């Protein structure tokens, strides 16, 4: 996509990315934030992936749920069924209830759009065996390999 710059020459358009979704408008890394990024016309979204005790790929930046939810503790110590009982609206309390999404749920939302997805795989603080393979397998299974940028931290 090209636009005209100040000097009248054509230039590439700056791309707009939703960091943790549209986290300025909705609780970060929640479906509401990703839906808002789509609604606002973002070119792409950035999200973070951690792994639950029962092996679910969940979208959350921190290794603990303390900062963004009404709960506390390490993501790795929660089964997904227990994790979704917490309210992840701490950064935007005006949202009555925001659940932590799975990576598959976010992929399903983004798949019908033309957005690019930057997936940050979290392995710096907590070592998750095989998380990279699990993310790659899901991405391939959902037909999104051409639209995903992977970043390991």
Stretches with model-predicted labels:
Residues 1-153:
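Phosphate-group recognition and catalysis centered on beta-loop-alpha active-site segments
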